[in-house]
Amino acid sequence: MSGSSAAPGPGSGSSPAACRFAHYFVLCGIDADSGLEPDELAGENFDQSPLRRTFKSKVLAHYPQNIEWNPFDQDAVNMLCMPKGLSFRTQADNKEPQFHSFIITREDGSRTYGFVLTFYEEVTSKQICTAMQTLYQMHNAEQYSSVYASSSCSMDSLASSIDEGDATSLLKLQRYNSYDINRDTLYVSKSICLITPLPFMQACKKFLFQLHKAVTSQQPPPLPLESYIHNILYEVPLPPPGRSLKFYGVYEPVICQRPGPNELPLSDYPLREACELLGLENLVQVFTCVLLEMQTLLYSQDYQRLMTVAEGITTLLFPFQWQHVYVPILPASLLHFLDAPVPYLMGLQSKEGTDRSKLELPQEANLCFVDIDNHFIELPEEFPQFPNKVDFIQELSEVLLQFGIPPEGSLHSSESATKLKNMVLKDLANDKKNGNVPNNSVSVYELLKGSETIARLQALAKRTGVTMEKIDLPASLSEKEKDLKLQCEEADLRDSQLNVQLREVFANRFTQMFADYEAFVIQTAQDMESWLTNREQMQNFDKASFLSDQPEPYLPFLSRFIETQMFATFIDNKIMSQWEEKDPLLRVFDSRIEKIRLYNVRAPTLRTSIYQKCSSLKEAAQSIEQRLMKMDHTAIHPHLLDMKIGQGKYEQGFFPKLQSDVLATGPANNNRWVSRSATAQRRKERLRQSSEHIGLDSDLREKYMQEARSLGKNLRQPKLSDLSPAVIAQTNWKFVEGLLKECRMKTKRMLVEKMGHEAVELGHGEANITGLEENTLIASLCDLLERIWSHGLLVKQGKSALWSHLLQFQDREEKQEHLTDSPVALGPERRKSDSGVMLPTLRVSLIQDMRHIQNMTEIKTDVGRARAWIRLSLEKKLLSQHLKQLLSNQPLTKKLYKRYAFLRCEEEREQFLYHLLSLNAVDYFCFTSVFTTIMIPYRSVIIPIKKLSNAIITSNPWICVSGELGDTGVMQIPKNLLEMTFECQNLGKLTTVQIGHDNSGLLAKWLVDCVMVRNEITGHTYRFPCGRWLGKGVDDGSLERILIGELMTSASDEDLGKQCRTPPQQKSPTTTRRLSITSLTGKPAKPNAGQIQEGIGEAVNNIVKHFHKPEKERGSLTVLLCGENGLVAALEQVFHHGFKSARIFHKNVFIWDFVEKAVAYFETTDQILDNEGDVLIQKPSSKTFCHYVNAINTAPRNIGKDGKFQILVCLGTRDHLLPQWIPLLAECPAITRMYEENALLRDHMTVNSLIRILQTIQDFTIVLEGSLIKGVDV
């Protein structure tokens, strides 16, 4: 094989191996010299009969010996060719050959495919037959002793039927599933395998079956087997992109085709089978799990089913690529891989008759378990649905039905096969009745034999196990081999067409969802080196803006998907395409987006959730049909090789010993395909070398990319070949390092997103994390904690490893607590205020928090309880502390975990707890906001100012607590008590407290400093400042007040009634306006006109910003209206400016007094006699103003004058009437009597400016909290 750039070295294969269809041919089986070696790594069960045990297999031969850039991995190939080692059979057993494929993912992420045909050969070695006989004698002796060992035994399903005294039964037992060297013929498994660079599964399967047929056929093959193997290794090239290729097997030609550069990448695994095995509903659910990078475990007795589903799912991910551990067939010796605390997609072979419940998996909290054989899946909790899932499945169903495949799957079952046969026969009978089919059966066949219907029928019948003889068609049908061959080819064509059409539907969903993704890619780096260096610190995708641009139903899925590694890699590839050749998948995807824009013009911001079907199905199917109908390339025919005479002698049933010298290297003569491919290869090599000189060193690039991603590529794909303890230990150490790094990244992300620094630094202005994004990040943290607690677990006791650990800790602590009779609590016992009213300290207890969760009947699973406990601990800022306490019980940790487990690596564990501790810097409400229906106990304390007021009053006090989720209703406070506890449905974040009394008795005046309310589960304590009197004839005469809450810090040991470490977020209305208790507070400094105007502008601006945020980001509107710097307080400052002092009037005068005088003026003055120009403007607004003021005055509430003004402002804001009322009041004659001449309300320019500012909130729909306007009927 000339035309290569360098002469091939001995035993190395030829240079242009990258252009060859197949790289290696491999033979695996029993080594006669080694004899029978039990496969200990496969977890051998010696209770089984020897024929059911597995033994070590070996690679007997492989050709060529090695390829320089793709070294032969002997251990991995042997392990995957025979994942359970050698198996033995006798003449009585089924010995049908079995085909399966496998994949080897190298550390750099590149893949090699293997295609294996396993068949059985007669054992000719007497040594092995004797060894098997000996094993059976030993096994039968053990069985004999076990049968007679007990008088009341029922040993197992077989032995239980044996009569203890019946020797004949024992003989039957020994004969069942046994081996007798004199009576039985022993067979052993052997595998032939092709290793290829691309997954041409159908072509390799046909070639291997022809090779096997040549071995088992009575007639020897036309040429020695070496000719066919040499041909496929060295003389069959890879078809170029967009072309088809025909090469020759032993008996028939084999056809394959490769998609073009602008088509979806090659996928030869039939999605039809995946749909039949799982059903469309399950397939889409598993696909969603893989998209969200959940741990996914496939489970089946059949290796090829595992590969078909795994490859089918990963193929559908286009344009994204699976970035983590990918082992579709997990050999029995590698079951420890399931302990990996990283996302994975793995396949596990089930043993015959094994129940799912007996399968012990290290971690199931975030596992998607797919039982392929039983058509059953188990999904993780908190699982978001794929966008437009119902319409999506409907579109996929239509495609399947066009190909005669039921969307619900299970067509492989015998029952479905029978239904199919009956359905087809019924259709034929109906056609005959209708006169569409002649009576003559031969004519029926002649009519149908060339049709698509019969081709599909025969292809389906072949798959479902319905033989053609069972259908009453003429015998001549089975004799027409050419017709069957054509039908078989047509079935393959239809499989390929179905494949591409299903994939087009999936690809179309992503094209629609991410049609505008480029608009949100952040490209800040000037060159590749600086981008790679700072990759970890940079945000590459504007997630918040992207999500705000999406339809609401898409958000639960998209918010989680854009956090995955596969999406991050996709965006990385997009940014890298500035400096280097675009990733092939990205190139195809971008071209499709361009096509959408050409045919479907739309603005990037006009997102819609209307489902848009795929429009390119016919086009995609036609391109495949055109390639298969007309061959672009035909490979050289197999031919005689220069072999030694007498070797390679044919012996039926035995695969011959191949001549290695003729298979070690390629041919010396020129080959036009190889020459052409080699030239292209050399050109590609020159371009690669050139780009290396110009651009960044590739090693440096790979280093940075590995560092930038959450786990390195070597961690994402552990090696299958080296299973030494040192390598396993090193792999585990990498897992530990990876978990620690992931924890650091997640906590940092949570902090940055919560504080909003990231968005500000990127120039997006102020940005707070949305509830949806926060929920996504916290769910991701819960998943990480579950994976950490599952790593290195010794004994699994439930689906949640974390909750299991907590339960065992709780059990030990409660036993200890009973012994010592002391509660587990941390922190001081009590907190006292200066007034002597005590707010009892909430116990800081891990066990108590667990009990809260255990009392929540809404949560049904251990995984749900663990997540709720994490959320509660995070909200209480105790997550790190609780976990530290949990892990402080070292004997328990040692009992539960292996030495290599993350939780037993002390240094890493301490760093992990430190990273979690950093989350205490921000406030989370992730428990309160999620569990909205649970009953929560609250404790309230009223703190009076004793120096100036009675602590106890004779009247009947009451309280009403309101939050974002509801209110308690009016609750009577027991007399002479300032503290009370109550239980009600979760109120959410607390916003207001209404407090009052009925003014009865002699001591009915009450000066309240503040009210404290605490959530007894989360520990959140709210302070509601008051500082005002409640009573008639004092202050503004109010018997009830509305107080606005501020959240206190949980760590402060100061007086809760006086101090607050954090700046107050909210204050009760009017507390900063003016206080009549001058002896206590002194006279506050009055703001000047400029400060007042600035305050108005700020208050209105805050309301405008509130409504410009996404709905889930908005805070409390009550605070913006009635809080310390709210609109009410700002307008009070305006109305107080220049207000004539009480010294002149000899009594306290309030703004409401001025309002009432204005109303009296409007009601008594006959405005019709006034200037008619003013009447038109004033009359409607003045009537409305009077109506609102009178409604407030007549409301059945004992609200003071300041409280009434607050209600008036709130209603005027809600109904957009303030800009009309302000000029009315400014022009009212009473203003000259009650205001100084320099007052702001008497300055026309200031009033006009105020009106313009208030008009900016006219377009917003303002909804007031019920507690603010309760009882006012307008």
UniProtKB/Swiss-Prot annotation:
An annotated GO cellular component: membrane
Keywords (A to Z) from UniProt: Acetylation, Guanine-nucleotide releasing factor, Membrane, Phosphoprotein, Repeat, Transmembrane, Transmembrane helix
Sequence positions bearing Phosphoserine: S49, S178, S822, S1068, S1076, S1079
Ranges for domain uDENN: 39-244
GO biological process: positive regulation of triglyceride transport
Domain (dDENN): residue spans on this chain: 401-581
Location, primary (coarse class): membrane
Subcellular location: Membrane
Ranges annotated as spanning the membrane: 916-936
Membrane topology: Single-pass membrane protein
Cited InterPro entries: cDENN_dom (IPR001194), dDENN_dom (IPR005112), DEN5A/B (IPR047278), DENN_C (IPR043153), PLAT/LH2_dom (IPR001024), PLAT/LH2_dom_sf (IPR036392), PLAT_RAB6IP1 (IPR047277), RUN1_DENND5B (IPR047293)
GO molecular function: guanyl-nucleotide exchange factor activity; small GTPase binding
Modified residues (N-acetylserine): S2
Domain PLAT: 936-1044
Pfam families, alphabetized: dDENN, DENN, PLAT, RUN, uDENN
Positions of the RUN domain: 772-932, 1118-1267
PROSITE patterns attached to this UniProt entry: DENN, PLAT, RUN
Phosphothreonine carried by residues: T1062
Domain cDENN: 263-399
Family: Belongs to the RAB6IP1 family.
Protein's job: Guanine nucleotide exchange factor (GEF) which may activate RAB39A and/or RAB39B. Promotes the exchange of GDP to GTP, converting inactive GDP-bound Rab proteins into their active GTP-bound form.
Name recorded for this polypeptide: DENN domain-containing protein 5B
Species annotation: Mus musculus
Gene designation: Dennd5b
